[in-house]
Structure formats: C-alpha cells, structure tokens
Amino acid sequence: MEPDAMTETPTELGTADIMRVMELLPHRYPFLLVDRITAINGDDSCIGIKNVTINEPQFTGHFPAMPVFPGVLLVEGMAQTAGAICCAHKLQNNTKPSRVYLMTIDKVKFRKPVVPGDTVEYHMKKVSNRRFMWWFRGEAKVNGVLVAEAEIGAMLVTE
C-alpha cells in the first residue's frame, strides 16, 4: 500500500438512508448492494448495510436447493461501501464528482456462508490514498461474526 498522501482531518458525516446511498453511488437494482450506511467518518471509514433477501435474482441459480449469497457480491458490496467514502469525500470538499473504479482486489477470504435473512455489515477503512488511487481494508460481518474480508484498490476518475 502507498503512504497516505493527504492529511485532511476526517469529518463525521453520519448516516445515509437508501435515497442518500443512491445519491452517493451510481449503482442501481439489481447491482446496488448497499441498502443504507450507518456511519461515514469523513474519508476514513464507513459501515454499509445489506439486507439479504430470497427474492434477489442471484438466488434462482446460486443455489436453488440451498441459497448462498455469492462471495463475489460480498466483495462488490465492500467495494461499493468504499466507493461511498470516496464520493462523500468529494461532496464534502466541493470538488467535481468522480466515478470510482475498482482496480485491485487482494487478500480475499470467505469465512462463512451468507444466506437469505442475513444482514451484512460492510466495515471499510481507508488505508491510504495517493492522488486518484485509494486503498481500503474491509470486513463483512453477520451478527458480529466475520464472513469475508478483502483489501481493495480504487481509482477516482473525474467525470
């Protein structure tokens, strides 16, 4: 990871319901994987929430007899939560909006299956950033139990 190139003081931005999440993120159904944000701490950290329900399209094939939320979608949910940190940072600093592109995924581990009825918490923390590249470390938890973890790199591209 690159050393932190910015020395801004994080500002508590609070929470975001689904309407605010849709202002921060460009994703939409069926690929919006963050239902709400319970904490945004400036450009430092964020907790996103995903309520997993049986009526989501991936469960028609993954797996019909024993539905399991796909691990790749857990990683995408972590990436979207990290993206909310980037977008909130841009809004807070009145800078031009950016698209956030996933660039790297490292050290991914899936610990336990996630099933319909679970509420996933995505705990994302910025590790560092340099110019347009930001790096995050994240965990996905259900009822406080670690179900997945990853390190994610993202690039901000001005629109």
UniProtKB/Swiss-Prot annotation:
It catalyses: a (3R)-hydroxyacyl-[ACP] = a (2E)-enoyl-[ACP] + H2O. One of its GO terms (biological process) is lipid A biosynthetic process. InterPro entries: FabA_FabZ (IPR013114), FabZ (IPR010084), HotDog_dom_sf (IPR029069). Gene3D superfamilies: Hotdog Thioesterase (3.10.129.10). Its EC number is 4.2.1.59. Signal peptide: none annotated. One of its GO terms (cellular component) is membrane. Involved in unsaturated fatty acids biosynthesis. Catalyzes the dehydration of short chain beta-hydroxyacyl-ACPs and long chain saturated and unsaturated beta-hydroxyacyl-ACPs. Its main location: cytoplasm. The keyword Lipid biosynthesis applies. It comes from Methylobacterium nodulans (strain LMG 21967 / CNCM I-2342 / ORS 2060). Belongs to the thioester dehydratase family. FabZ subfamily. Transmembrane segments: none annotated. Keywords: Cytoplasm, Lipid A biosynthesis, Lipid biosynthesis, Lipid metabolism, Lyase. It is found in: Cytoplasm. The lineage of its organism: Bacteria, Pseudomonadati, Pseudomonadota, Alphaproteobacteria, Hyphomicrobiales. This is 3-hydroxyacyl-[acyl-carrier-protein] dehydratase FabZ. The active site is at residue 62. One of its GO terms (molecular function) is (3R)-hydroxyacyl-[acyl-carrier-protein] dehydratase activity.
